[in-house]
């Protein structure tokens, strides 16, 4: 029922309440009341992003009627990636995926501890609250949204902002890894401690 399972060869990740759960979905559109989830993946990292463990990746079955309602961009993007064919062939429901993902995550972090991590993650959370409500409650109510740093960097440090180029694969697992890489980039180039600031710049007074 899973397309991709966690690899036994990956570095061991110790269960810890500071571990971070990264998540991404692909949907048929942007409206959680009328559109549906068609792919979901999770990755768990330690708090410093040094160790990552991939969870299952699920294509969620949806009817041909639902898929036909997608706009041209979604049909083209998800058709080109092969996701539409995977969705048609899948027998996994939202409930199936949610139960298996929650069981996987419980190995690494307790319910209610990890924020939901990703890019524009509030959109994923809206869909999860609509179609996977029990799974949504597994997460802390806070989000760790990399797009917040993206928007600040674009306004405050545009040269640094332009230094990270997204591949825009629009598959759930690839997008998660890209979000983690993007946060690492901002940590190195944008979130610079005062002691490491360029010469001539001083930290503001407390």
Curated annotation (Swiss-Prot):
SUPFAM superfamilies: Ribonuclease H-like. Residues 20-183 form the Exonuclease domain. InterPro entries: Exonuclease_RNaseT/DNA_pol3, Oligoribonuclease, RNaseH-like_sf, RNaseH_sf. The active site is at residue 141. GO terms for molecular function: 3'-5'-RNA exonuclease activity; nucleic acid binding. Disulfide bonds: none annotated. Keywords: Cytoplasm, Exonuclease, Hydrolase, Nuclease. It holds the Pfam family RNase_T. Its EC number is 3.1.15.-. One of its GO terms (cellular component) is cytoplasm. It comes from the Bacteria. One of its GO terms (biological process) is DNA metabolic process. It is found in: Cytoplasm. Its main location: cytoplasm. The keyword Hydrolase applies. 3'-to-5' exoribonuclease specific for small oligoribonucleotides. Belongs to the oligoribonuclease family. This is Oligoribonuclease.
